[in-house]
Amino acid sequence: MDPFVGWFQKEQEGPSLCTWLKIWETNAQEMGALLNQQLQQATTINGSTSSSSSSSNSGNNNNNNNNNIINNTITNTTNNTGNNSSAKPYLSRPYSSLNRVLNFRADSLEILQQQQQQQQLNGTTQRNSTNINTTSGGSTSSSADSTTNRDNNSPANSSSTNGPGAGTGTSTGAGGTGTNSPATTASSTAATTTGPATSMSDTSNNPPQSTTTPASRTNSIYYNPSRKKRPENKAGGAHYYMNNHMEMIAKYKGEPWRKPDYPYGEGVIGLHEEIEHFYQYVLPTPCEHAIRNEVVKRIEAVVHSIWPQAVVEIFGSFRTGLFLPTSDIDLVVLGLWEKLPLRTLEFELVSRGIAEACTVRVLDKASVPIIKLTDRETQVKVDISFNMQSGVQSAELIKKFKRDYPVLEKLVLVLKQFLLLRDLNEVFTGGISSYSLILMCISFLQMHPRGIYHDTANLGVLLLEFFELYGRRFNYMKIGISIKNGGRYMPKDELQRDMVDGHRPSLLCIEDPLTPGNDIGRSSYGVFQVQQAFKCAYRVLALAVSPLNLLGIDPRVNSILGRIIHITDDVIDYREWIRENFEHLVVVDRISPLPTAAPTAYATANGAPKYVIMPSGAVVQQLYHHPVQVPTAHGHSHAHSHSHGHAHPGAHLCQPYVTGTTVSAVTTTTTMAVVTVGVSAGGVQQQQQQQNATAHTHSQQQTQNQSQSRHRRGSTSSGDDSEDSKDGDVVETTSSAQEVVDIALSTPNGLANMSMPMPVHAVGMPASNSWSGNGNGNGNSSSSTGSSPEIAHIAAQEMDPELEDQQQQQQHQETSGGNGFIRPGDVGTGSNRGGGDGSGGRNYNQRNNHNSSGYYHQQYYVPPPMQQQLSKSNSSSNYHQQHHHSHSHGNHSHRQQHHHQQQHHHQQRPQHLRVGGGNRYQKSLGGSPIISAGNASNSSSNCSNSSSSSGSNNSRLPPLRGTLVNSSSAISIISISSESSIASSSSSSSRSGQDQQRDER
């Protein structure tokens, strides 16, 4: 095995290890032909110093004293490589690294050097001195260079005269790298300065003594266990034994994920079980999540104190949930600046005590200027960038693929730890970034011949196949990677035509799925080292899981996964340190038990759980502060909030959870007011039977069924707003003065059988939009309760009060399940509870359609003056809506004419403002989905046969459609949702709309 990318296993230790080291060191250092030449040169230099008393030296002071001369003055000049007598000047490795190897096990190079030194000692006269005392620059704070003094058996004093730039030298035996030759310990006395030169007086004792002090033992420096980036915390990039990796795992043995009494299986079964346990171990604890949230809050407070209108967003691994315990936090500040205020923010962060000045670095010359800092209290590392919205878009894209491939996150976390140990996880050091690694994993799963869409796949087999593909099979020279449109491998010649600025494809060419022409792996110049590491890992794991079991590995005793990855003692100590010092941030206060399969809650606030522990161990945090209940705007909204879908303005304002077939939540965010679709099935047919009790309600239902095709495809607002909402219209909701933080981590098995808290309704938005099917896709009878305000209002006035109360009670039971939580069976993308062919889960047959429909598009920040203009526009539209509530009875022809005008207006709208495709859904920044509404052609055909109750006019359309609406500056919201919301598929609704249209014809 190549020791530069891995380490030796237990079965490799023995007599053959020294031979292997000798072969490797001879070949790697190219010492075969040069070793004799170097030794001869060293012998020649030593012979010349015996006859003449002059030697050359640069950073090291070599004082060679000859007893034939009583007072010997030595002039020191330049020598860039160190001690000449030990044959070290021509070695490429530092001597301290070789000494660490010697402390563990002597290699061939050290043995040869010792033999040569012994021969030199035997060939010299007794009156020549060959003692070496080396003081390392790291052991003394007064000198950066090492001082070497050679004195032996001489009663006379020798003085060395340094150049004008020399300083006072100190010689200590503690930092020396002594040899086995007879030596005397030289004690340095006071140094006297004469003119421009520095005179150093050394006295020596006559009795010969041998002193050997390992430098690696004396230079032990204590580091805070939270510091991630340390040169010695790597297992690759240098020899395994050169960086004391065995000492780094001596305390906990490097395998804390293994369960002592667990019966691990043989081969790939045991490897799969270990990967599962590793994933469970590295998941963040509630305390670790809390400290990260506190760090984000402190930095966000500083940013808002400087720029009240700025927006702070989280992206990267903390947003996607694919972060290790020592990973950093990636933040982006969105605002309007002519010049990025890097130095301003740096000064404020240091002056307010967020970070120490020595830990803050401003990389203003980088392609993406960032501020790197380490939080003073928690030692969490943070990277802050400005106006880089591509990171948020990439995070949302990764979260989408996490839902499509449940095994993705487990595979990625193992690979990230694998590259971290080998120092191959940073682009500026030649490695590959986390984003590149995730895209490689996505491409691997997309191109897998078996089609990995379920979470029951063997992770051990997948890990082996990943190492085999990118370590042995993949052609890095000619092939590029693309994950768009279902994924493919493409020739680099084809990619070069699309590259921006005429750049050639890099060695690791990965097409950016969000920015055409951008190469993600362009800066990874050390791809061959990564390939070599993958290749080595494949060989190690293949031998370990082989059915022949040639290595004699017992999986119940020896770890298979531990042969390629370890968790160092520093990481384990850091997690324990976090738990001991910051456990007060998570107040354990158990409340009443939740329904079956529901999360366990901690630290409730106003009845809503603050922290939720998922069954897999993942942490979901809902609130930092208590939600503020906004008073009811008018009685009509409160009276009909259940029967007509008019949301209470302050009802559950802060709860972030949403499922695919239930009413979704609307949270006020700093960057966007998210409008989601709610689908409540089960009581639609009974409601239609109740409405058929009277002739008037029967006629109203016919009108309602005619207009259903317009609301069926993802409309989220009232009847006069359906066309606007499906085009990504932004609605500004009521803002509160409290800070809301919504954090949810993904679960390993998706959200198929997980209960969620009660959904939230937006201010002025419908609470439900239900449909039901008859099982064969034909003759679907739909009810758009809450979609058309005036129709629902008229029906409510004509309805008997008892029927209305019964309807309200039924809808409340269907929505809340009686316990305030959605039933597990309600969760699923594209499922129809009223019938039809919905499966309640993901429809993986439509994967290519989802991939071909495009990706998440991030919108932009809008200044407050434009927000006020948009608010006025929304206010005028609400006025027109209320006006039509009271005056549109019997004006069917007028509504029909107005609907055609509005339809014609939307057909002429620019296509770039339309969001989504027929089978596409989007995720908002806060984790709540935005249901994209079908194609424009289907929209026009469906809406042409329906009567509209629209109460808006051209003033209803804001001038900045498709842009983000920032809330007031007092609102501060951070959304880090990963799996807490799943958008319902619009494909089923589109098919239902087409079937309804055929029935009407």
Swiss-Prot record:
Residues 44-92, 115-238, 631-652, 687-740, 767-963, 977-1001 are annotated as: Disordered. CDD domains: NT_PAP_TUTase. Residues 164-178, 827-841 have a biased composition (Gly residues). InterPro entries: MTPAP-like_central (IPR054708), NT_sf (IPR043519), PAP_assoc (IPR002058), Trf4-like (IPR045862). Mn(2+) binds at residues 328, 330. Disruption phenotype: RNAi-mediated knockdown causes lethality at the third-instar larval or early pupal stage. Residues 844-854 have a biased composition (Polar residues). Keywords: Cytoplasm, Isomerase, Magnesium, Manganese, Metal-binding, mRNA processing, Nucleotidyltransferase, Transferase. Low activity with Mg(2+). It comes from the Eukaryota. It is an enzyme of class 2 (transferase). GO terms for cellular component: cytoplasm; nucleolus; TRAMP complex. Residues 635-649, 881-912 have a biased composition (Basic residues). It is found in: Cytoplasm. It catalyses: RNA(n) + ATP = RNA(n)-3'-adenine ribonucleotide + diphosphate. GO terms for molecular function: isomerase activity; metal ion binding; poly(A) RNA polymerase activity. Its main location: cytoplasm. Disulfide bonds: none annotated. Its EC number is 2.7.7.19. Residues 458-517 form the PAP-associated domain. Residues 44-86, 127-163, 179-216, 687-708, 768-788, 855-880, 932-955, 977-992 have a biased composition (Low complexity). Its cofactor is Mn(2+). Involved in a post-transcriptional quality control mechanism limiting inappropriate expression of genetic information. Polyadenylation is required for the degradative activity of the exosome on several of its nuclear RNA substrates. Polyadenylates RNA processing and degradation intermediates of snRNAs and mRNAs. This is Non-canonical poly(A) RNA polymerase protein Trf4-1. It comes from Drosophila melanogaster.
